[in-house]
């Protein structure tokens, strides 16, 4: 087994120095990965990025812009998957340059690791359903980019050690682990907040994916449901549990979003929620 160097990992978790252009790292706040589920077009994606950058600068929250350039895991064959890989990646590159903010996006197969990295993506995200795919983890690791591994809905937090080791063995200690809920029956997820300290034992930053944790998957309609009215509750509990970072998908009008609208945070609610979460963080 690969032995994770927790001294290196803990130092990185504390400073997050391996994420280029990450601001406000000395604020003592949690860091935030947030944005739309998928790049829908340049105008709306820029609007979301600009809005969150203004909020996080005001609140001094370290911020990474999040958007998938392509959605490979959709329920139905005719579900929206993207506007085109290169077009979407170009938009992410423009956002990084325009707002001087790091960006994170998902990859789904080996060639996509180098493709996304070539557009300057700072964090390569491994989707939960792919978190055990050794070749994919190794391909992401070999780019030298930070790798955010989402915990599969079917995995224990302890088992995520082995996913992290697959990246570390490639000489890349830039790892993050994300809790995104555990399957509860066929069509529901629950969050076991014990996962946060259990995964922090490995020494890497642990993120709570707030919005995906509220999904209601496997609906007979072929459209994933969600309970966005619980976003605030799950986010508050996550901060109270000591999570290092939060992941939230957001949109100006979730009802018109092209993917995952049922569990998104409405963009105009973002600042108020983050303000409340900072207050919780300050009393820990």
Indicate where each model-derived feature is located.
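Glycine-rich, proline-tolerant flexible connector loops at the mouths of alpha/beta enzymes
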Residues: 36-45, 63-85, 250-261
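Alpha-helix-loop-beta-strand connector modules within alpha/beta enzyme cores
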Residues: 52, 80-103, 140-146, 197-206, ...
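Conserved anion-binding
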Residues: 75, 129-198
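Active-site glycine- and acidic-residue-rich loops that bind
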Residues: 37-50, 150-161, 180-198, 216-235
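Glycine-enriched alpha-helix->loop->beta-strand junction motifs that scaffold or abut catalytic
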Residues: 115-125, 139-147, 168-174, 202-205, ...
